[in-house]
């Protein structure tokens, strides 16, 4: 691992990364519990579940898992190709809009509707989000796949023990916070499914609205403080 320069940890980017990993865990738990044991973010899990199902002759939800995997891949591919035209490079927050709108719609779709019409579109939106957001404070991370983040955590802590450079310690702590955020999203979603069942997904647009409003208020507060200091 290369030697990292000391970085000033951006509170804004860290909050956003924590929020995105929380949402990824939240949506994954929802689709796994409510929508046919399928994951929209953890595609490795889908491959394992699909393979085991095929061996055990349990192919009832195989099509949904295959379409979920393909949809996620298409989301990543399309955003990579068109992100500059869609202004996602300058405003990656725009990639959250499809997920928010779709979650709002799915919250009112009954469980009798086939999951192949529900989970793949969510996976497509998750592909957009995980492609648009790829770093926090200049450190690459993934808001959907925790295996890579776990590896980066241990690499960072290992490098800190070896070199005693504080930058590695800070990086390791960032990844720990991301892992905890993902777990909290899973736990929170799993608990809410007991109460709200399929409507649990409505928590996504609600949380996004609150988070976006807090970002706007924080930005306005900073601008106001700058004006006061200037005067």
Label for each model-derived stretch:
Residues 76-89, 193:
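Helix-to-loop junctions at the C-terminal end of transmembrane segments
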Residues 13, 17-60, 129-170:
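Small-residue-rich hydrophobic segments that form or flank transmembrane alpha-helices
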Residues 93-106, 205:
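Structural signature of the two symmetry-related core transmembrane helices
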Residues 100-114, 215, 219:
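C-terminal ends and interior cores of transmembrane alpha-helices
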Residues 1-13, 226:
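Short, Lys/Arg-rich, polar N-terminal cytosolic tail immediately upstream
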Residues 84-98, 198-200:
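Cytoplasmic membrane-interface "Motif A"-like loop-to-helix N-cap segments
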Residues 69, 73-77, 179-187:
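Hydrophobic/small/kink-forming positions within alpha-helical transmembrane segments
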